[in-house]
């Protein structure tokens, strides 16, 4: 789960457009475009006085649909209204049908991570620009994220490695305390985000490593497992450490919905890993949950209702982790779900992660396209939520003490007091803006097997239908959408090359 920014390279042209459009009497600010390298590389520029907004769906008449389109050439959430009309026998049209009677998983939400790097970059902006950035993610005129991930202590996207208790053999955690980074770069912006969402933001926390003195390696950076026997003091203390963290954040006004046991536990087998990691196998994580973490959470006021997620690693590991952990009834009673990463698809939730692309690329469409493809495939296979990595990064793709620079949906240029919304930001919004928590995926059938296009459909808690379509072709594609409840009628949507569309209509 991740993303970041790009180097402020010389651009061929810089074009700024500032438009206001009126929708039902409300002025909506459109994308202020800036081109980089080539005309297909487009970002939307925001600063202290201006930031683009997303027009609301509004009041739709019977048979009307609001259609939002974003494409490679700079169109961003362009809203039009179309209607269901009688079906025809036209050729060259892609036919598909949805059926809201056939329902699958319920959606938890979409979001990103409140890393130190994100907080440092948000903090580098003026108050007005900072507010516009947070509104872009969490506000009603933004893409309305409903999930936030919070690292427990440091990650590589910190300026240094730190823990909450560096006192060896402190098995009572009497020296536990949050770090300056929590108070400067995490908690203030988490609380603002919670307020912007009206309190619906679900937060989950994840550790990258226990303090070094608890590990076999003796240090946070690099792999290593918890020291001692599985029933020993290090395992007990580490379980209590989660509770201490939850209590400390609650005392500062932040309540958590969920928790993962360990970020990328398999990486902890590598002692030479370049940043914080800690090893669990499926068996050792199972035993840690049932013997220590589960009971510790269950008996605490802050942890008894926590949604605990296992694995938090590459999806290729999923079958064995589910089999080993969830077949054990004692462990399974504490587990609410499974967290997976998408790195093994070679398109991680933080694109720009491969050695040859360790940097942001301003305006790059291909990375947004990879996001859209992965999200559609995940949602089509029972995934209930999708969380990105860093909310924002600087032009270099950091800060990151391990120099593991990547890309992000928003790139911050602190010198200019502005930030750039990447195509990835808008791709995320085509899902997060229109699929609220509690929505259910519904049946979507293509009459002809999709080639270079795909889609996924939902019904919201207010019974609106939401359809997302992705065109990965280099040519336009026209879709004819039928719904079982609207027999004999179809909605036509034409998608330009390299584009995504979200259609919303009433029951």
How would you describe each model-predicted region?
Residues 1-2, 8, 453, 497:
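Generic signature of intrinsically disordered, low-complexity, basic-rich segments
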Residues 6-14, 176-181, 349-354, 469:
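Generic low-polarity alpha-helical segments
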Residues 1-6, 12-41:
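N-terminal signal peptide
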Residues 26-94, 98, 203-205, 240-257, ...:
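Substrate-binding and catalytic surfaces of secreted/luminal carbohydrate-active proteins
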Residues 8, 21, 170-171, 176, ...:
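Short linear motifs in intrinsically disordered/low-complexity regions
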Residues 72-257, 261, 277-281, 287, ...:
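N-terminal catalytic cores of secreted or lumenal carbohydrate-active enzymes
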């Amino acid at each position: 789960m991740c993303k970041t920014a790009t180097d402020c390279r010389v651009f061929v042209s810089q074009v700024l457009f500032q438009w206001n459009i009126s929708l039902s009497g409300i002025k909506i600010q459109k994308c202020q475009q800036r081109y980089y390298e080539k005309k297909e590389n487009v970002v939307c520029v925001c600063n202290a006085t201006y930031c683009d907004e997303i027009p609301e769906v509004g009041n739709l008449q019977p048979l009307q649909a609001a259609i939002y389109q974003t494409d490679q050439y700079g169109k961003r959430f362009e809203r039009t209204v179309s209607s269901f009309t009688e079906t025809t026998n036209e050729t060259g049209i892609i036919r598909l049908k949805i059926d809201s009677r056939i329902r699958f998983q319920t959606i938890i939400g979409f979001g990103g991570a409140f890393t130190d790097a994100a907080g440092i970059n948000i903090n580098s902006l003026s108050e007005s620009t900072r507010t516009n950035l947070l509104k872009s993610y969490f506000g009603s005129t933004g893409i309305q994220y409903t999930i936030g991930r919070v690292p427990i202590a440091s990650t590589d996207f910190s300026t240094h490695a730190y823990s909450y208790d560096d006192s060896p053999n402190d098995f009572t955690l009497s020296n536990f305390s949050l770090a300056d980074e929590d108070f400067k770069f995490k908690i203030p912006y988490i609380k603002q985000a919670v307020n912007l969402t009206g309190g619906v933001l679900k937060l989950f926390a994840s550790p990258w490593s226990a303090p070094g003195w608890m590990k076999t390696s003796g240090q946070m950076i690099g792999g290593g497992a918890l020291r001692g026997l599985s029933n020993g003091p290090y395992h007990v203390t580490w379980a209590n450490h989660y509770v201490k963290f939850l209590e400390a954040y609650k005392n500062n006004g932040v309540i958590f919905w969920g928790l993962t046991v360990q970020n990328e536990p398999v990486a902890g087998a590598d002692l030479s890993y370049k940043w914080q990691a800690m090893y669990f196998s499926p068996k050792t994580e199972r035993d840690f949950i049932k013997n220590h973490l589960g009971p510790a959470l269950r008996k605490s006021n802050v942890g008894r209702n926590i949604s605990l997620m296992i694995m938090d690693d590459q999806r290729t590991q999923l079958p064995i982790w589910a089999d080993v952990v969830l077949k054990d009834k004692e462990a399974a009673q504490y587990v609410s779900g499974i967290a997976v990463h998408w790195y093994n698809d070679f398109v991680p939730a933080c694109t720009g992660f491969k050695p040859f692309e360790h940097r942001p690329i301003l305006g790059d469409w291909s990375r947004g396209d990879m996001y859209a493809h992965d999200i559609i495939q995940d949602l089509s296979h029972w995934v209930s939520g999708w969380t990105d990595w860093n909310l924002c990064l600087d032009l270099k793709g950091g800060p990151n003490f391990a120099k593991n620079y990547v890309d992000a949906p928003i790139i911050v240029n602190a010198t200019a007091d502005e930030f750039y919304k990447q195509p990835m930001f808008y791709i995320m919004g085509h899902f997060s803006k229109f699929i609220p928590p509690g929505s259910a995926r519904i049946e979507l059938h293509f009459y002809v097997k999709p080639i270079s296009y795909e889609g996924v459909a939902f019904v919201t808690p207010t019974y609106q239908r939401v359809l997302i379509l992705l065109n990965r072709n280099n040519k336009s594609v026209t879709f004819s959408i039928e719904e079982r409840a609207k027999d004999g009628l179809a909605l036509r949507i034409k998608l330009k090359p390299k584009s995504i569309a979200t259609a919303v209509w009433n029951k």
